[in-house]
């Protein structure tokens, strides 16, 4: 077993918001390396309206903003952003999905031991992996969605963008997302035309 502590954040980032950043910051504070897997990388629909290249770019820019919070100006972990296609569909919580995710993490992180940082229900993650994997390889750090930034969600952020609620939006997203709101609005509007 290696001594490098590895954290994994799995999120779709449609778009990245301050709740995601709280989760990422905690993972960075507690690990040597952090892998941010951007899920549903291969999807474009109402639930997944922002192309993966833009989500990845905004995540990178948000991390640059996050680094400024540290005295050194550097995030204390080695951070990697990795697009992750869905295995079947995003509601798949089977062991097949768990093994798919596990092998992707193993390939990227080069370790079978990691902590997943997540803000949805505990029961969801426990359905992904057989008990022996949970017991031997995977630790969980669950942060209640309501506990991160007063329960902000990407769905709420997208609504603020569509409604042009710039004042409220500015409170909940990194500056890079706020600055990109018109481009994001066009992607969201286009995706909303798809039935």
Go through the PLM ranges and name each one.
Residues 1-195:
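Nucleotidyltransferase catalytic core that binds NTPs
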